């Protein structure tokens, strides 16, 4: 277990040296209306008087404790980056191949379209519940205060970062199953970073993983997605043989 976590942390630290480029507008495989409806398949966020919310509060203070670990805090700060390019660069090392538009055009195209598609699954619930974020409720800055003003106007439930991160590792694990354990461990860590930063409650992150899984299942009903996935797998085999 210790060796496994060491490899994950090594991947995280190495990735920080990979350059991040500007995002591009891309088409999606489905519209928001065609994606799974979180209001129908997941419960509402915990009521503030519930035991579940007490757990959220406990995890918030756990996150603040984790900030005392300078290495983990630095990872959480980096993970605050919303860009697709950051996610691709961060997961390139556990994936085993540098994911860029130039080096892996088919994988890059697939990931980009998937990312913008899965983004849609959480939008309706965010607007409907408009849940207050932890740093807002406790009236103190998050670990990444430059985002606080914008985030305070955007619902906390579910975690959009977690939806992006978890769906990405699901896809990369399908392309390279041999690295699935390490990829999933990094994807899990990516979601926990949102708790450490103080941008999300634990239940936001948990819901984000479930929403990402539902969105990923929906992607597999798209012929265009399946065709591009086939190209991405072929590209990976060619690059790693």
Regions found by a protein language model. Name each.
Residues 24-197, 221, 228, 239-241:
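Hydrophobic alpha-helical bundle signature of multipass membrane enzymes
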Residues 161-165, 198-235:
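Alpha-helical transmembrane segments that form the membrane-embedded catalytic/substrate-binding core
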Residues 1-23:
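Bacterial Sec-dependent N-terminal signal peptides
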Residues 12-13, 171, 214:
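Alpha-helical transmembrane segments and their juxtamembrane interfaces
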Residues 15-16, 174, 217:
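Residues in and immediately flanking transmembrane alpha helices
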């Amino acid at each position: 277990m210790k060796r496994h976590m060491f490899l994950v942390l090594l991947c995280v630290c190495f990735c920080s040296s990979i350059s991040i480029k500007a995002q591009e507008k891309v088409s999606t495989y489905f519209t928001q209306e065609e994606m799974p409806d979180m209001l129908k398949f997941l419960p509402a966020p915990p009521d503030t008087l519930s035991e579940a919310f007490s757990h959220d509060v406990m995890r918030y203070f756990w996150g603040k404790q984790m900030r005392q670990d300078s290495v983990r805090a630095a990872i959480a700060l980096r993970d605050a980056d919303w860009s697709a390019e950051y996610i691709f660069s961060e997961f390139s090392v556990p994936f085993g191949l540098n994911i860029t538009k130039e080096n892996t055009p088919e994988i890059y195209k697939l990931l980009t379209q998937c990312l913008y598609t899965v983004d849609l699954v959480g939008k309706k619930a965010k607007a409907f519940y408009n849940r207050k974020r932890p740093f807002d409720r406790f009236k103190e800055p998050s670990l990444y205060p430059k985002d606080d003003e914008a985030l305070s106007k955007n619902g906390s439930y579910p975690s959009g970062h977690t939806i992006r991160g978890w769906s990405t590792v699901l896809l990369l694990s399908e392309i390279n199953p041999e690295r699935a354990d390490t990829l999933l461990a990094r994807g899990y860590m990516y979601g926990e970073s949102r708790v450490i930063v103080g941008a999300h409650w634990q239940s936001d992150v948990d819901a984000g993983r479930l929403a990402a899984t539902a969105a990923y299942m929906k992607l597999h009903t798209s012929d265009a997605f399946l065709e591009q996935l086939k190209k991405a797998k072929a590209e990976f085999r060619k690059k790693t043989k």
